[in-house]
Design a protein with these regions (language model features):
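Short loop/beta submotifs within extracellular cysteine-rich repeat domains
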Residues: 137, 202-207, 289-294
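Solvent-exposed N-terminal domain segments of exported/luminal and surface proteins
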Residues: 23, 30-179
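Extracellular/lumenal glycan-associated surfaces
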Residues: 154-156, 190-203, 277-290
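Short helix-loop boundary/capping segments
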Residues: 177, 199-252
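Long, compositionally biased interface segments
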Residues: 37, 52-56, 249-316
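Bacterial N-terminal signal peptides that target proteins for export
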Residues: 1-8
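C-terminal motif of bacterial Sec signal peptides marking the signal peptidase cleavage site
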Residues: 15-18
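Short, flexible domain-boundary/linker segments around small modular repeats
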Residues: 149-184, 237-271
Length: 316
């Protein structure tokens, strides 16, 4: 049975919206990237939502692009963890002059839900991304990428909105639409590796301590769905995906969605991101396809080891 994310996880969606918004109607200028790499500027009306009063993250301060962003990685020492029989999450954040380096054992910080035929085991993730990323002349498609596109601030790999070739009746389908993800937007793969295809800023998922919930492999930060409208981030708005469902996402998800920003308020670009008030690019995790990253706006850093591996097919 296929379950709409908007219905099945409405509680999580409302929690996501409760991270900050402008309380009064207003107008804002939203600058975004097209697939050709050109910037477009539109005026978007900011309207109040029916969501509960917004909560500002405990750490509302945001690092300047180029600073070592250790402050946005949450303290995981007191989290529940995957379960008594599993290792606790371990995440190490370091920076060189040019790179952000994150090492993780890949263990979720919340209870593991066995939704696939695969188990859950510790991994040896090491991600290296540019500390001072720049927007590329053209965007890079991720439609054929089956593997890591980034990582969360809790040390988990981020995959695209596409599952692998197994099960065959859902080959390369939308894992959110097909209902094969847990309440935090993840599941385990063939190598017993936990990864996220979607991100939800729920307290349970330990992604509420900062507006930034992850980083893409091109180095740009991934925010939750709330976007800053000024440099100090004292004014915010909820941003949404620009993709419409135009086909059946059960299989080949990229054939089932079409980008269309017409008539939408606070819509993101085709990469699911935008240029913020400080002039730098950022992605946003959204409740709708492509959920996290729609394409790379910058140049992805070549990874090594496990981080460079493609996503193997699911068992069974």
């Amino acid at each position: 049975m296929k379950i709409s994310r908007n219905i099945a996880l409405a509680v999580v969606a409302f929690t996501l919206m409760a991270c900050g918004s402008s309380s009064d109607a207003d107008n804002s200028v939203v600058t975004s990237m097209t697939e050709s790499g050109a910037e477009t500027t539109t005026t978007a009306e900011i309207v109040s939502t029916e969501a509960p009063a917004p909560d500002v993250p405990a750490n509302s301060a945001l690092p300047v692009l180029g600073e070592c962003p250790t402050s946005v990685f949450p303290d995981l020492t007191a989290v529940t963890g995957a379960g008594e029989e599993y290792a606790m999450p371990e995440v190490l954040v370091e920076c060189t002059d040019a790179e952000l380096v994150v090492t993780s054992n890949g263990m979720p910080s919340y209870a593991y839900e066995p939704l696939t035929p695969n188990g859950l085991e510790e991994q040896a993730w090491v991600w290296r991304v540019a500390l001072k990323p720049t927007v590329a002349a053209t965007t890079t498609s991720i439609a054929d990428v089956l593997g890591t596109l980034g990582f969360t601030t809790t040390g988990l790999p981020i995959y695209g909105p596409t599952e692998g070739p197994v099960p065959t009746d859902q080959a390369f389908g939308d894992p959110v639409y097909n209902g094969i993800l847990d309440t935090c937007g993840g599941h385990t793969g063939y190598n017993a590796d936990y990864h996220n295809h979607a991100l939800y800023s729920d307290v349970y998922c330990n992604l509420t301590s900062s507006y930034i919930v992850g980083y893409a492999l091109d180095g740009f930060p991934i925010y939750n769905s709330v976007g800053c409208l000024n440099v100090d981030c004292t004014e915010t708005a909820q941003f949404i995906s620009g993709y419409d469902m135009t086909g059946d996402p059960t299989s080949y998800s990229w054939n089932a969605y079409t980008y269309n920003s017409t008539g939408k308020t606070n819509v993101l670009d085709e990469c699911n991101g935008r240029i913020g008030p400080d002039g730098t690019y950022r992605y946003h995790a959204t409740d709708a396809f492509p959920y996290i990253i729609g394409c790379f706006a910058g140049t992805s850093t070549t990874q090594t080891g496990n981080a460079a591996a493609d996503m193997p097919p699911m068992r069974g």
